[in-house]
Amino acid sequence: MLREEVAVSTRTLQWRCVESRTDSKRLYYGRFVLSPLMKGQADTIGIAMRRALLGEIEGTCITHAKSEKIPHEYSTIVGIEESVHEILMNLKEIVLRSNLYGTCDASICVKGPINITAKDIISPPSVEIVDTTQHIASLTEPFDLCIGLQIERNRGYRMKTPNKAQNGSYPIDAVFMPVRNANHSIHSYGNGNEKQEILFLEIWTNGSLTPKEALHEASRNLIDLFIPFLHAEEQDIILEDNQNRVTLPFFTFHDGLAKLKKKNEIALKFIFIDQSELPSRTYNCLKKSNINTLLDLLNKSQEDLLKIEHFRIEDVKRVLGILQKRFVIDLPKNKFSN
């Protein structure tokens, strides 16, 4: 009787945090373990959790900046050390925490000379600045500067559209991703049919939430995704014959790819390929070749991809289709096509 109770208890899934540290105000790290799992379950959970951590958790960013003193994005203003473009990039890096729904307004109103930091941002009580020491600009002359800001809570990423500045309002690339990175690893133990697995999950965040908070939110989001399968099947949904057909678009290489990579390099580093809805086989081939982000992928040509072990022309077409559909970009056929 006692032996049976012990056997049952060892099969109860348990998780715990085995390491937690704060490297800086904008870099938190956590390492978690989940066990015991049956063979294959650790990879299933690990892949799903990583995708949810990187793509399903909402974050808060500054998405627009507006000032009457800014003639255009690449101008310089007398009395300010930084160019307008540099100021916008500094605003992009500001880490915010909020329970905001949608958007809200904030502002910076200062009189020089002064070193403007994140603490000078006047924001609603629902928005908290994680690191008030983050640098924005340096005013070297005695004049007034007011910048209007738009703050938004969302998920994923949004690249600004070129030439969309209106009335002195400039869009800023937004990376609504509080989780900087997430990795999982698997440890197997036992013999034969009794083999079990331990899942290790590592999470890095930008300080707007802790790794444990990120783990909880990602788990809730995954549960919400699966809940519909617990309900009765809808019987009155009729699909047309052509609704399940996918037509691959005609692919052309855009000459602006190199320019796109250079201009959006930071944002592209934070777009991981497992957010691109690639089939698991295609994703695993890319992963084994150290292609982890969209920037890594854009540095390859179609010819490079075909050199990857077990990578087929069908896989290349899938990659091209997703790049064209989601980002309106393409890969060159070879290194000399651009």
UniProtKB/Swiss-Prot annotation:
UniProt organism field: Nandina domestica (Heavenly bamboo)
The record's note on its domains: The N-terminal domain is essential for RNAP assembly and basal transcription, whereas the C-terminal domain is involved in interaction with transcriptional regulators and with upstream promoter elements.
TM stretches of this protein: none
Signal peptide start and end residues: none
Subunit structure as annotated in this protein's UniProt entry: In plastids the minimal PEP RNA polymerase catalytic core is composed of four subunits: alpha, beta, beta', and beta''. When a (nuclear-encoded) sigma factor is associated with the core the holoenzyme is formed, which can initiate transcription.
Entry EC no(s): 2.7.7.6
GO annotations of cellular component type: chloroplast; DNA-directed RNA polymerase complex; mitochondrion
Catalytic activity: RNA(n) + a ribonucleoside 5'-triphosphate = RNA(n+1) + diphosphate
Role description: DNA-dependent RNA polymerase catalyzes the transcription of DNA into RNA using the four ribonucleoside triphosphates as substrates.
Subcellular location: Plastid, Chloroplast
InterPro entries assigned to the protein according to its UniProt record, in alphabetical order: DNA-dir_RNA_pol_insert, DNA-dir_RNA_pol_RpoA/D/Rpb3, DNA-dir_RpoA, RBP11-like, RNAP_asu_C, RNApol_insert_sf
Coarse class of the protein's main subcellular location: plastid
GO BP of this protein: DNA-templated transcription
UniProt xrefs under SUPFAM superfamilies: C-terminal domain of RNA polymerase alpha subunit, Insert subdomain of RNA polymerase alpha subunit, RBP11-like subunits of RNA polymerase
Keywords: Chloroplast, DNA-directed RNA polymerase, Nucleotidyltransferase, Plastid, Transcription, Transferase
Family assignment from sequence similarity: Belongs to the RNA polymerase alpha chain family.
Pfam family membership, one: RNA_pol_A_CTD
Molecular function (Gene Ontology), one example: DNA binding
Region (Alpha C-terminal domain (alpha-CTD)): 266-338
HAMAP family documented for this protein: RNApol_bact_RpoA
Region (Alpha N-terminal domain (alpha-NTD)): 1-233
Top-level EC class as recorded in UniProt: transferase
Protein name: DNA-directed RNA polymerase subunit alpha
